[in-house]
Structure formats: C-alpha cells, structure tokens
Amino acid sequence: MATQSFSVAPSVQWTERDATLQTSPSVVVQGATVGKFQWGEVELPVLVTGGETGLVKKFFKPNDSTATDFLVIADFLSYSSMAWVTRVVGPLAKNSVTKGQTAITIKNKLDFETASPSASITWAGRYPGSLGNDIAINVCDSAGFPTWEFRNNFAYAPQSGEFHVVVVDKVGRITDSAGAVGQVDRISVSGTATAAGTISVAGEDIAYLDTDTPATLATKIGAALTALTDVYSSVVVKSNTVIVTHKAIGPQTVTAIVPDDKGLTATAVITTVGASGSIIEKYELMQNTQGSKKSDGANAYFKDVINDTSNWVYTFATALAAGVVELEGGVDDYNINRVAAIQVLNNAEAYDAKPVFAYCEELIEQQALIDLSTERKDTVSFVSPLRDTVVGNRGREMDDVVSWRESLVRDSSYFFMDDNWAYVYDKYNDKMRWIPACGGTAGVWARSIEIAGIYKSPAFHNRGKYNNYNRMAWSASSDERAVLYRNQINSIVTFSNEGIVLYGDKTGLTRPSAFDRINVRGLFIMAEQNIAAIAKYYLGENNDAFTRSLFSNAVRPYIRQLANMGAIYDGKVKCDEDNNTADVIAANQMVAGIWLKPEYSINWVYLDFAAVRPDMEFSEIESGGGIVAAS
C-alpha cells in the first residue's frame, strides 16, 4: 500500500492497493534436447527458433556421425518450431586456429572470455570441429582495396586506418559452393640455346646446356618448381609448357621469370584467376582503436564487433593487418556422453520447456533424461527403446521392449515411453536412416498442446498422427499393445488407410492414479506453473485475512477457466485461517490448498449392440436384459 507522508495541514490523503492480480491458463510450448553436431555452442543451451532452418543456422547440417541426433530434433521441430538445444562434444574436440599453431578448445562464449592462447594465435574457429578448417579470414586495407577480389561486395572503400574483413569458406562445404580456386599459371619455354645459361623461375636458378631444347628446359623447370611444396600444389609438364597451381588461395602474383641472354627464354601467364572462396560473413570499415565508431554511430572496433556477432570465428589479434589468415587444426570428437549436457538443462527458470527428448545411445542417458523431468517437475521426458530392441529384431520386439522398460528402473509420471523407431529420409546426405520416434512423439504432444491444450490427450486418431515417417520398425498387434500398455509403453501403430498413429497416453507411473495419463500430468504442470507465477507477488506481504483473500480471489477465476475449457470437472482454493495457523504465520509462510478434479481421456470404447423385437420397447433393453451371445 502506497501512501503520502503525514501532513499536519489540511490536505487530501490517498492510498493505493493492487487487488487486480490474476492469472490465465497458459503454457510455453518449446522443447529441450541435447545432441552431437558439426558446429555450434558446446554445453550451453541455445534456443533454436524457426524450425529445421533455425537448427541448421545454429548447428549446421548433419554428416553421417551427427545425422541421427540432428534428424530426431528436426523431427520435433516439424511440429513445434522452438527448442533449447545443447551440443555435446568428446574430450578430444579442438577449435581450428591460425595456420601453423597448436589447436585449442573453446566450447562457448564463456570459455572464450577466459581463454589466453599464445600470441601467435590471432584467429580461431568459433566452435570445436573440423568444419573450422574450411575457414579463412581475408583483411583488406585502403591500399589494397582497388585490386581486392572482394571489393564488389562492399559499398565503400576503406580510408586510412579502416579495414574490410571477410570470413571465407575456402572449401565450399559451408556455402554449398565450389570453394577456393588456386590460381593457375602457364609457363611457356621457347628459343634456341646459343650457350649454356641460367634462367630464374619463381626465384629458383635453373641451369641449362647449350644442347637443351625448350622441352628439356621445361622438364628442368618442372622439377625445380615441384620441390616448392609451400608455393605450388600442382606442377605439370607438357612438352615445352609447365602448368602450375598456386597453393595459396585467392589471386596471386604471376610466377616471376628472369631469363638470361643465352637464347632460351620463358613467359608466364595466368590462365585461371585464383579465388579465396565464398563469403560467409563480412565486416565493413573496422578499426583498431577501442571505442571507435562509424559515421552512423555503430561500433567499429573490430574485436568487439567480430567477437560479439560472428557465428564462425573469434579473433585474438591485437590489431587488424591486410592479408589472409587460414585456419587449421580443428578436430571432431563424437565419442560423447550426453548425461552432463542433460544435467545442464536442470534450470527451469533459464530453460523453460515442456517436452524433453534426445537420441540416446545408452540406457544411462535415458535415465538421466527421465531424472531431469522428475527433478524439474515442469517437463515430460520422451524416450524410445534402444535401436537393437526394435530395428532388425523381427518377432522379438515386444519382449525386448518390455525388457528395456524394466531396465529403465524408473517410476514417474514425468516421462513417456513409445515403442518404435522410424525410417526417414536424410535430405542432407541423400540417404534413408533409422531414428528413434521420441522426437516425433514429443512433437505430437507439443502440437496437441498448441491446438487443443496441455490438458488434452495427444494420442489416437484425432491428434496422434505422425507427419514425417516413411515406415516404422514394427507395428504391435492388439495383443502386443495390451502387454506393452500394462507396462506403461505407448505403441506407435501403422494403419493402412490412416497412417501412423500414437496409440496410448500413459505416463511412466506404475501405480493406478490420475497422473498415469499425460493429459492429467500436463494439466497439473500448467496449473502449478501458472498459480506459482502469481503467488510470488505475495512474497513480503503480511499473512493476514486481506492478503489471503486477494490470493484466493486471484485463483478462483483461474479454476473457473479450467472448468470452462474442459480441463477439469471442478476445483477449489482454500487459503484462510484454517490452513494458515499461528504457527504457519510465525514461520513466515502462507499455505494454500488447491484441489482439482481432472478430466479423463477415453482409452477404451465399448459398444453394446442389441437386436430388439418389434413388440419390445427400447426402455426394456436399456435395463441390460437379453442374452449375450458369442456369435
């Protein structure tokens, strides 16, 4: 309550109270997952938006080693476009660094801020992985701009003290282009020797005899240039011609030739202009002075701009200088353990999520995933059997899936099991792959939350259809589904005319309870979060009748909304002197009882058909009379 200060003189005093606090049923639908990728922040959750396109932008396209992780997450993102994604690498992973230097490991921005590499490392790949070896950094100053190969990509020429910087894909893997092209020079030898002599080619003095022909001298030149492995990547001799390819990327000075006056001579021309590759990122009018600004007021200090915004490099340089820096030494390590990355997600305030899922190669990773949701109590973890349980295991799928469930040794309403793997197309590598269905099942739940509400079942024919699968590893029969369902395992069933459908909505809770269905668990997750969000505004207030009344009046409309939406049959809030005794008040607590009667989803439909004689009334059969026949 806000008041004016006391006044002795006549005045009007005012007070202000806020009795408008309220809440509405709402839930943020985004997933959380971990996996191995070719690129991206490591051990630091990244919010991917924009579906699969956003996943590629943050973590790059998959290769054979990362495809399963990638496709499981892409599967989820086809239903719900947002997810927290945490990349995992093995202990041997390295970032690429300035050519000729020893590679280091920088997992994320926090690592970079504490890194202190040797002074010889001026640039590094942003993240661990061999993909960083494809990168070069090309810096241009005012003197070199008129002939710079990338000059047409910039609107303004740099002035004295300014630099243009481009990050270049020299291989073509990043930009799906041809990559860098080495300059090719053709050296043509001609003339007739009048005496023994010497010709200088690329700084190498090559002697010839008075009997040597142009073809003979060309062979000698080829042998000399072949030894220059740091200069030329290829040397080919054809008759009196030597064709060389420069090792350095980008345009180069044509091979220098200095003939003598003994009759044999040579000329060099450029037949293929070198190219450094395709631009990934560019930075215009950078400066070396900290605090420098562009004319529009934007930051121009190169270290701040590049290190804060680049998705591909970090710079440790003290100053920019014209030239090309190639990166090397990046190493992939896909020998990972996902458990540590899963535990990073155990921060509900920082990483709001509902479905949690991941491709898991080991049982301990699935257990960690389940434990995460059980501890957070605001998410549901989705798991599928390990691959060999269902893929290529014809006839033993049911038994092995049940054994897998038993080996999980987990009993909680905060996880959800399906029984299948799916066969999907990997468009990035042009091949079919098996992936666990957990990403799709999590996506089906996320889609159901968005279109029907978290308090509705995501399963069966109305909301339980999958989008992306070519076929499933197996489809349990009715009898097999009954066995699986008794073990809290939800089947994914293939119907010839309706497609692939999730056929169950049980959580992993073994005891008979309302919480053994995911719609009830979802309802309580939402209600607990929504009401807790408003309850925090009562911290610091006095535990008196007025405060308790305010709280109750804020929650009652919420309960009515739940009932009107079909989430509950009925509900009640109690926050008064009965449950806020003197002891509770003295302990600086406020206690509220919130009781909800949840709706239940239909899992079985029983249809009772009866043949009725013409002289009978329907009311007679409604009482249950008649003979139950087997045929």
Swiss-Prot record:
Transmembrane segments: none
Key word Transferase present: no
UniProt-listed Pfam families: Phage_sheath_1C
Keyword terms of this UniProt record: Host cytoplasm, Viral contractile tail ejection system, Viral genome ejection through host cell envelope, Viral penetration into host cytoplasm, Viral tail protein, Viral tail sheath protein, Virion, Virus entry into host cell
Main subcellular location of this protein, as a coarse class: virion
The protein's role, per its UniProt record: Polymerizes as an extended structure around the baseplate-tail tube complex. During ejection, the sheath shifts to a contracted form, thereby making the inner tail tube protrude through the host cell envelope.
Assembly behavior: Homomultimer.
Name listed for the protein in its UniProt record: Tail sheath protein
Taxonomic path: Viruses, Duplodnaviria, Heunggongvirae, Uroviricota, Caudoviricetes
